[in-house]
């Protein structure tokens, strides 16, 4: 079958093999990428696509993806197969769960180099960033699940009430069934495998749909999952919109989606048809409020780490904008400039430690933000672009118009607007004027301001005096609130999001009181009222026909 790939997919795919995606003629789609006198084959196992390339500025082409047909019928058969295997009880045992988790850990250890290469092909992600942000985080989550799985699976004993005496009660976790994980392109390994770890630990059958915009990672995940995991209950489906649509038309026991709000609405609408519960890991405009009493160098370094050293700003928890006072702004900007040069050199566009923009579409989106009326003249640092390499230098802007798209939309790139206020407390109103973000950051030594920030700022998560690190704490839930998402995961929260907590009450055949059965009499009512009010003395009096007032 010839699959028509999205333009973004093709552009990303071309760049992964060293061909400039910036000159693609997007006016014609589908299109053929051709060259006089021959073609080329992407032999890398991570990207199984046959392409023909060109030397010309204007290109047109069809890309043939070497993949099997995947229609609604195939999707239905897949879900039926996985549900049958789930219903057999195969995934519910501790032995199956632990073996699959151990296989994931082994996969990460044995294929770390392949994973790193795929992340570089898709995003030019530096090796150390790939290890810290994706590989080590995923391995850590897997090892925690292996260590704690027996404890997580154990029933939780809870208290019973006097009305059920004698009895005992437990909360028993059970797997939901067959679940769908749809992941994002910006951290394509972490955001694919981490929720799958939770789904497996909870005993589910799972289908992973990786993002087609990160084709090298998508192809690698399909290859590795088929090699390391139980394919009768764990599958990867590659593809774009048609494949995702076919999957969403099926009945799932849960859908876990990481991505943007626009697609999330489509996911929710599809899930509503079958009353399927969803987890939506989205994003938003994550603010960093910077007080004037901070260690300026440390604050600047940590803001950079949570912006440009975090996939070049293409992160849902990355710093989207900074708020500080008018008097302090120039000092903060100078500190950021100094540390940016230390991190990325005088020409950041040539730095190997700065990821590229994922594809031409997102590059153009960011470029248009910079060129918007009233924005370009607000640049105080950076603003350099290189379209052929899909790179934008770390860019700082001061007091861009509130009505600009840069302040109304999630930036998701290396542009950092700084908004100034008279008093640092005025920053709270700026944050509250926007939808609730996935993360919010505060830099201060003022404990009262810190307390107020935690109490008054509604966000998925908060880090004080740093950025993004809260997501590495596995005992903290990671998820959004409001428009930044629904539900949470990481650590035990991943296990719980893919589990149903079933309440179970155990009773014997003894202690069968007549009080609960007809005929209902005034005496029974007196005794039951006393019992339900936990007044044992009154219950005894009522049992013998006396009221507590007699």
Swiss-Prot record:
Active site: 281, 316
Protein name, entry field: Aldehyde dehydrogenase family 3 member I1, chloroplastic
Signal peptide region: none
Annotated NAD(+) binding sites: 259-264
Domain of life: Eukaryota
Transit peptide extent on chain: 1-59
Gene Ontology molecular function, alphabetical: 3-chloroallyl aldehyde dehydrogenase activity; aldehyde dehydrogenase (NAD+) activity; aldehyde dehydrogenase (NADP+) activity
The organism of origin for this protein: Arabidopsis thaliana
Activity across pH: Optimum pH is 9.0.
Effect of mutating residue 142 to S: No effect on solubility, but decreased activity
Regulation: Thiol-based regulation. Inactivation after dimerization under oxidizing conditions.
Gene giving rise to this polypeptide: ALDH3I1
